[in-house]
Amino acid sequence: MNCDPDVTECVTFPAVSPDNQLTRAFMQLSHYRFSIAWPRLMPDGTKASLNQKGLDHYNKVINALLAAGVTPMATLYHWDLPQTLQDKGGWPNPELADLFNDYARVCFKEFGDRVRTLTSC
């Protein structure tokens, strides 16, 4: 499995469409929580590296859930810090608070119209 930031195969469910068997199974759920991978949206952890393929992927996931009548709930951080930020010291680095704020704002802007619950671990 290729888990590069611009590849969508490394995900909870590999193909999202109304015909997908897993998507149909979600119809029995009222809510579904999934993680948005910071490295997928911003591979180097900054707005400058915003990855359109990553945005498209999560829009597809969210739209498929909504089409199935399932309320999406997204976790913004679930232990997947971009490697470049880990290399700069990880969370103890004071710059990370501002970078996470930028990432969270992008998520709210891009997905907040459809995802009403965004959390972090």
Identify the function of each model-found stretch:
Residues 1, 9-19:
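Short catalytic helix/loop segments, enriched in acidic residues and glycine
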Residues 2-5, 22-121:
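Substrate-binding cleft and catalytic face of glycoside hydrolase catalytic domains
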